[in-house]
Amino acid sequence: MPSEHPFSDGISTPNPKETMNDTAQITASYGRRYIVRTPDGTTYEASTRKKRVDFACGDRVRISPVNAEQVVIEDFLPRQSLLYRQDAWKTKLIAANVTQLLIVTAAVPSPSVRLLQRALLAAEAAGIRAVIVLNKADLPETALWREKLKFYETLGYPVIETRALENAGSLRPALQGHSNILLGQSGMGKSTLTNALLGSQTARTGDISAALDSGKHTTTHARLYDLNGETQLIDSPGLQEFGLHHLQAADLPRYFPDFRHLVGQCRFHNCTHRAEPGCAFKAAAETRAASPERLAFLQGITDELPG
């Protein structure tokens, strides 16, 4: 009798060497351990060769069988996108092949403008559509934060209000047809939103959590879910910082919707947008055609980038 795979919902698993498709998608990542799913829906525990860690949740990969329950990831297939962060010491892959980043914020606990702005820059650099989710919108503390988010709407970033303890219905139309990732600080309600969106699928997360030695729904690693045949959702761990050392200083202005139209308009081609005469960026900030705070943010990010 074929052995029964613990993550296949009770469906028996035939001999993998006879039936396994050699491609799969990573649906959970935890260090160098992964869960992958083949096109026929079968899931396997997966490891990598030579301690490789350059794989991300959402990656489509080539695999080789080890036994009925385990495979080895050989390499990843070409990526549509890669969202990651990098500081002076290390690079952290967040997700691959996503088409939409949903930055989950809330007035409680205290939201980070710094994290929001950095995540938006990373999305712009990766060519990923960004949406801001104002969660816990029914809290009385929300009014001030809602007002601050109006600025980002003027830059072209949609702001969607949700109440995670309800059904997250306001979010569903925006997710449709995208490979989505929820990202934000700890405590903003990402996992609660995920539960609300998944409905009956939520119970399955316990098995994957057990396989990766984590709590039932404490998000310590990224996980991918299918909302329907056209829509995927990745829930990611909470974070407090978003390093941008992978960006090039010369490219930064193009990632600012409020400044990109000024690229090439300064008097000097190597303008640092600080003290040079004829700086279009400074002129825009001085006349309030652009935000002085945003120019200061651009200057600050430029200063911290290597080289």
Curated annotation (Swiss-Prot):
One of its GO terms (cellular component) is cytoplasm. Its cofactor is Zn(2+). It is an enzyme of class 3 (hydrolase). Keywords: Cytoplasm, GTP-binding, Hydrolase, Metal-binding, Nucleotide-binding, Ribosome biogenesis, RNA-binding, rRNA-binding, Zinc. One of its GO terms (molecular function) is metal ion binding. GTP binds at residues 135-138, 184-192. Its EC number is 3.6.1.-. Zn(2+) binds at residues 266, 271, 273, 279. One of its GO terms (biological process) is ribosomal small subunit biogenesis. InterPro entries: G_CP_dom, P-loop_NTPase, Ribosome_biogen_GTPase_RsgA, RsgA_GTPase_dom. The keyword RNA-binding applies. The keyword rRNA-binding applies. Binds 1 zinc ion per subunit. It is found in: Cytoplasm. Residues 10-20 have a biased composition (Polar residues). Residues 85-242 form the CP-type G domain. Residues 1-20 are annotated as: Disordered. One of several proteins that assist in the late maturation steps of the functional core of the 30S ribosomal subunit. Helps release RbfA from mature subunits. May play a role in the assembly of ribosomal proteins into the subunit. Circularly permuted GTPase that catalyzes slow GTP hydrolysis, GTPase activity is stimulated by the 30S ribosomal subunit. Monomer. Associates with 30S ribosomal subunit, binds 16S rRNA. This is Small ribosomal subunit biogenesis GTPase RsgA. It comes from Neisseria meningitidis serogroup A / serotype 4A (strain DSM 15465 / Z2491).
